[in-house]
Design a protein with these regions (language model features):
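Pocket-lining segment of extracytoplasmic ligand-binding domains
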Residues: 135-136, 210-214, 219-310
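Short, glycine-/small- and polar/acidic-enriched structural segments
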Residues: 31-209
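Short, solvent-exposed loop/beta-turn-alpha elements that line the ligand-binding surface or hinge
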Residues: 79-98, 180, 250-256, 271, ...
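Secondary-structure end/capping motifs
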Residues: 273-364
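Bacterial lipoprotein signal-peptidase II cleavage site
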Residues: 19-37
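Conserved C-terminal helix/tail region of periplasmic/extracytoplasmic solute-binding proteins
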Residues: 347-391
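Sec-dependent bacterial lipoprotein signal peptides
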Residues: 1-20
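Small-molecule pocket liners
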Residues: 154-160, 164, 259-263, 268, ...
């Protein structure tokens, strides 16, 4: 589902939430690199110079934000910002050492005319990894197949939110729908899912959400889409016309069980990139944990990039800090429950995702009727370091 967000204005930073991580420490290092950090020991797990592209290109699906913290956390302090191309490039730094290659992080959204990440990956052969939602991977399976190699968030931060003053007895989406609320979204997938899971009347679906707050402020009877990592903070702290809490429930609780923005490769490049992925995937697993443990510097970079790109996307330090906290407190970034490994995919869950979303996408005409997808074609756990845990 295409992501949209309410415009954000400046706010005070929130307190950071500590998080302990479990993983191997940095490998013994040798010389100092251009980034000012020790260079990874040659041939070690953190030395990417002999196996990865000279510049590892990471493609996101939206503007700079804290949900993408693991990518931006890899960017060394020697970074440069291309304000015309909207990219940031620097030494790829992991666990305190320079890995011997550069990293370039590219945003999605208006910079690339809102094209999907899978489309961008097939247009630009230089992209190493892209953030491809599982439902998007299903949609593009026939023409632009991608294979996810690790997750970053375990559960989607997408929500439906409501006014607790209007619905004082409601604790779930189903409760609000039962009281006759109209569901305001920007697409058809969520309403179709709600029809199946909580009995939403199709007549109560409004897909004209435009990412602004005006409708919700004017009509607090609405049940509106948003992100747990943004809208609750924004509405309470940055929208003067509202200026109070909202209640919400995660869509993952009611069947929207995709992996959000897992890192994927083009299917036809998996073999070529295997030597790189054997080292890069564990680095990405640990990068998310390290970011959530201490998001301060990365959040500063994210806010700087949002300002520099000047696309109309405004992102405050307050939202960034709230997002990092919420990724932990709402259980969005957790170990895979089936294996206890952070970043690993659950085969049974992948089967459930295919079983849920193929019929929905067929009904919308996104997929032809009779589409058959083997879930194992959508992901691999081959490169996962099973010793890495967020607990």
């Amino acid at each position: 589902m295409k992501r949209t967000r309410t415009a954000i204005i400046a706010a005070a930073a929130a307190a950071l939430l500590g998080l302990t991580s479990c993983s191997a420490g940095a490998t013994e290092t040798s010389e100092t690199s251009d980034s000012g950090l020790p260079a990874a020991e040659a041939g070690s797990a953190l030395d990417l110079s002999d196996v990865c592209p000279a510049t590892v290109v990471l493609q996101q699906d939206w503007e700079p934000e804290a949900e993408h913290g693991a990518m931006y956390a890899l960017v060394g302090s020697d970074y440069t910002i291309d304000e015309e191309g909207n990219t940031v490039t620097g030494s790829l730094v992991a666990q305190g050492v320079d890995t011997g290659v550069d990293v370039q992080v590219r945003p999605g959204g208006p910079t690339y005319s809102y094209q999907s990440v899978s489309t961008l990956m097939y247009l630009d052969d230089s992209i190493t990894l892209g953030a491809v939602n599982t439902d998007q991977a299903i949609s593009s399976y026939a023409d632009q197949p991608t294979i996810a190699v690790t997750s970053q968030l375990t559960y989607s931060p997408q929500i439906l939110m409501w006014d607790p003053d209007t619905y004082p007895d409601a604790t779930t989406i189903a409760d609000v729908i039962a009281e006759g609320a109209t569901v305001l979204t920007s697409g058809d997938i969520v309403p179709a899912l709600l029809e199946e899971t909580v009995g939403l009347d199709p007549a109560k679906s409004d897909t004209s959400y435009d990412s602004t707050s005006a409708r919700f402020v004017a009509d607090p009877s609405l049940l509106q889409q948003g992100f747990a990592t943004a809208e609750p903070y924004i509405y309470e702290n940055e929208i003067a016309e509202w200026d109070k809490p909202v209640d919400y429930q995660l869509l993952s609780d009611i069947g929207y069980n995709i992996y959000p923005e897992p890192l994927a490769v083009r299917a036809d490049k998996l073999e070529e990139l295997t030597p790189c992925l054997e080292k890069l995937v564990p680095i990405m697993q640990q990068s998310q944990i390290d970011y959530l443990n201490d998001p301060t510097e990365t959040n500063e970079l994210i806010v700087e990039l949002a300002e520099a790109y000047d696309t109309g996307w405004v992102y405050s330090e307050g939202v960034a800090d709230y997002s990092a906290q919420t990724q932990v407190s709402d259980g969005l970034a957790v170990d895979d429950p089936a294996s206890g490994v952070f970043g690993q995919f659950d085969p049974d869950r992948m089967q459930e995702i295919v079983d849920t979303f193929v019929p929905l996408l067929e009904a919308q005409g996104t997929l032809p009727e009779g589409t058959e997808i083997d879930p194992e074609d959508l992901y691999t756990n081959e490169f996962i370091d099973t010793s890495i845990s967020i607990d």
